Amino acid sequence: MSDIKSSTLELVGKTPIVNASRYAAKAGVTDATILVKLEAFNPAGSVKDRIAKAMIDDAEAKGALKAGSVIIEPTSGNTGIGLASVAAARGYRIIIVMPETMSVERRQLMKAYGAELVLTEGAKGMKGAIAKADELAKEIPNSFIPGQFVNPANPEVHKKTTGPEIWEDLDGKVDILVAGVGTGGTLSGVGGYLKSQNPNVKVVAVEPAGSPVLSKGTAGAHKIQGIGAGFVPDVLDTRVYDEIITVENQDAFATGRKIGHQEGVLVGISSG
């Protein structure tokens, strides 16, 4: 029987979970099982495909997006890639605004999907990109900013999909969730769902040591792309996490490489 999808967007979600047993063994972890959810299996390669599709679906349902609309989004990278993919599949023009410090590879991926890029001063971080996106939205008719940092559809899609997927795949045997905080949508949605199933689940938020906004209230420069926006996002539910840990740039780089070498899985800096 044929199984042909009408769009790549039907492939978003339902990603597999693997046991990082070799990494755990080499790290000396003997009292825990480390599991990794492979969000790279999404069509555009990251967990951000989920929120990209969710925010566009939500906007279309509410009439905020229609034929001829222009999508504008400030992003540090993967959300832009996800949105560029969704925009291409739905036929929208899209402009991505991002700090100039983000990797060239991410820029090339967005352009490959047909996105237009506007780069902002790196020192101004995501705040600078957000301000520029707002400026462009005022200048361009029929424009729409999904606003991943403030859009409730962001954590909601994780509450409806990512969280339940983890719970079901593990038969409810979840003790600890560890997630980096960029917008905070993944941690808030997944963590909130898991705690609704079992209040004893511990949720750990990860942020860059160079920009410990959640743990110390101070923002700064760092090299862990994808997390550490430099402010507390509106969609982050600070009641969900039980602990905050900070990670140094070099530790994130090194761990990401170790996972590739030891598990055969290529992950980004924020996963490291």
Give the positions of each predicted feature:
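PLP-dependent amino-acid enzyme catalytic core
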Residues: 1-272
